[in-house]
């Protein structure tokens, strides 16, 4: 059964489809591992791996960074444009020819954008992956909380688990530390690079959830 959320007296499903491999009912502890370079400041890997559920986002790497970010990924939340056309050009995400093949044991949870390209890439490289899609109405709910065009995958992950009644531990959400200015812990990103997300607004949303004891922020 696909879980629903009720907001302003309206109910709608969280997922467009839900494969049987996604069983949130049994989850007691969950780690949302974001992509900030602040993750390199601490060896949280073993702590992260102890969670029942570990969620990562987009192109976040694990291999070579296990002591910082853990070694397991249960769900990877992906923007529909996360592959940036690479799945059609035989060039894998992040210019790493082996990256897609390292994801073969992960479950994908996808925002409903550029879906055809995404599925073509998955079927070509790693067709064992279960693919699930967030419902457009749930995405609209998330996007309406910010003034930018769309909420980040990191915020969507937070709202997803909180909506499901799961209190997550947040790792690597960069706006909680200034000790490392790398946007992504595994790569150098141009200082002029813009995500198009409103992280100040997103921080305020997450702060409010923290104040209401709905999540933990691990620094």
Give the location of each predicted region.
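Metal-ion/cofactor- or nucleotide/acyl-coenzyme-handling active-site neighborhoods
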Residues: 1-219
């Amino acid at each position: 059964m696909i879980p629903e959320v009720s907001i302003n007296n309206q109910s709608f499903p969280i997922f467009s489809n839900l494969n049987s491999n996604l069983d949130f009912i049994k989850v007691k502890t969950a780690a949302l591992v974001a992509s900030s370079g602040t993750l390199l400041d601490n060896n949280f890997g073993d702590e992260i791996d102890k969670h029942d559920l570990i969620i990562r986002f987009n192109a976040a790497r694990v291999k070579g960074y296990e002591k910082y970010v853990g070694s397991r990924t249960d769900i990877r939340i992906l923007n529909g444009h996360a592959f940036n056309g690479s799945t059609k050009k035989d060039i894998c995400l992040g210019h790493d020819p082996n990256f897609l093949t390292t994801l073969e044991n992960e479950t994908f949870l996808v925002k409903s954008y550029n879906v055809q390209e995404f599925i073509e890439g998955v079927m070509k490289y790693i067709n064992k992956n279960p693919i699930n899609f967030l419902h457009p109405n749930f995405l609209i709910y998330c996007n309406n909380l910010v003034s930018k065009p769309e909420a980040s995958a990191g915020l969507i992950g937070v709202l997803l688990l909180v909506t499901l009644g799961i209190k997550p531990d947040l790792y690597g959400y960069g706006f909680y530390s200034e000790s490392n200015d790398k946007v992504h812990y595994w790569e150098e990103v141009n200082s002029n690079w813009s995500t198009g997300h409103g992280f100040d607004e997103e921080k305020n949303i997450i702060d409010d959830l923290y104040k209401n004891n709905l999540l933990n922020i691990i620094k």
